[in-house]
Amino acid sequence: LPYGIDITPDGKVWFARLHTDEIGSIDPDSGKITMIATPFRGPRRLRADAAGKLWITAFPESAIVRFDPATSRFTRFDLPLSPKGGDTPYALNVDRPRGIVWVNGNQSDSLYTFDIANETWANIPLPRRVTFTRDVEFEPDGTAYTAIAHFPGWHVEDGQSTLIRVQRP
């Protein structure tokens, strides 16, 4: 099941395969498809940073993982929680100009940010409770937006879909 797709700055198409624990790439010139097994379970959404490295959610493992296509190396970053495993990162996106990975925390009613250069985390509590955010997107100034799922409605406190505007602290 392909689940998540992005294009790196070099034009290569990358995708995650959720139930096979793989990521893959498609060379746009040759059409060649390359599959790579991941050392973690449940690769879900992935995005590329400005340097062409991929950031991938490890949904059932409470982590995000960086993959460097140049070295084929995976580097794991556990979400900053105690106890470990207490959140499920459904999706992420990379604010390329600022080098920040934004991660949806679906059991904590929050978003996490990961500063790529410093490898440091921040946690941003959301103004709503019992949320299940699905993705993150940005304005040019770095303001982030996340959406609360609308289906099934019991995922959210009042059953209403919501768009939330978030500023990084």
Which residues make up each language-model segment?
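Beta-rich, blade/repeat-based domains predominating
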Residues: 1-10, 39-51, 61, 82-98, ...
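Residue-level signal for WD-repeat beta-propeller blades
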Residues: 7-8, 17, 27, 48-49, ...
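Surface-exposed loop/turn positions within WD40 beta-propeller blades
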Residues: 10, 19-20, 30, 51, ...
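Conserved beta-strand positions in repeat-built beta-propeller and related beta-rich domains
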Residues: 13-19, 54-60, 95, 101-107, ...
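A short loop-to-beta-strand structural motif that recurs across blades of beta-propeller domains
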Residues: 21-25, 62-66, 109-112, 159-165
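Short loop/turn segments that connect beta-strands within beta-propeller blades
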Residues: 27-31, 68-72, 115-119, 167-169
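A short beta-strand motif characteristic of beta-propeller blades
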Residues: 32-37, 73-82, 120-125
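Blade-level signature of beta-propeller repeat domains, shared across WD40, Kelch, NHL, RCC1
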Residues: 133-169
